[in-house]
Regions:
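Catalytic phosphate/metal-binding cores of nucleic-acid and nucleotide-processing enzymes, i.e., regions
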Residues: 1-131
Length: 131
């Protein structure tokens, strides 16, 4: 199988994963144009995300992220969804974007720290291990 076919197959697998997660309108993007209107996979339910999809054994994640950043433009969050043979999917994004996303989620625990407002996100102290 050539790399173009492998790429298409990876894009279809990522699209299917999004659909299984409830994002039923996910579809492969327009591949001939490049740029913000042509992510590898588009998902109308996640309008602020630009997906670049990579299905390769040895991924240069920096190059893939650069492509996603360049193609995402200023209004979308660049995300690289990547996998390799016999492996699950990984998602790579910039730390600032991840922190923004996690702050908006229900994964942030309340804290009693008086300086909680100065933290980029709330934290819960980890209990000391038992002897």
């Amino acid at each position: 199988m050539n790399s173009r076919e492998k790429g298409k197959r990876g894009e279809r697998r990522w699209r299917d994963m999004l659909r299984e997660a409830g994002f039923q309108k996910a579809h492969r993007g327009v591949q001939y144009a490049g740029g913000t209107d042509s992510p590898d996979v588009a998902c109308p339910e996640l309008p602020g995300i630009h997906f670049e999809v990579k299905a390769v054994e040895a991924l240069n994640i920096w190059r893939a992220m650069d492509q996603s950043i360049r193609n995402a433009g200023v209004r979308k969050t660049p995300v690289v969804a990547h996998t390799r043979n016999r492996s699950g999917w990984l998602v790579t994004m910039r730390a600032d974007d991840w922190l923004t996303l996690i702050r908006q989620s229900d994964h942030v625990a309340a804290t009693e720290s008086p300086n909680a407002d100065s933290l980029p996100f709330a934290t819960t102290p980890t209990p000391a291990p038992s002897p």
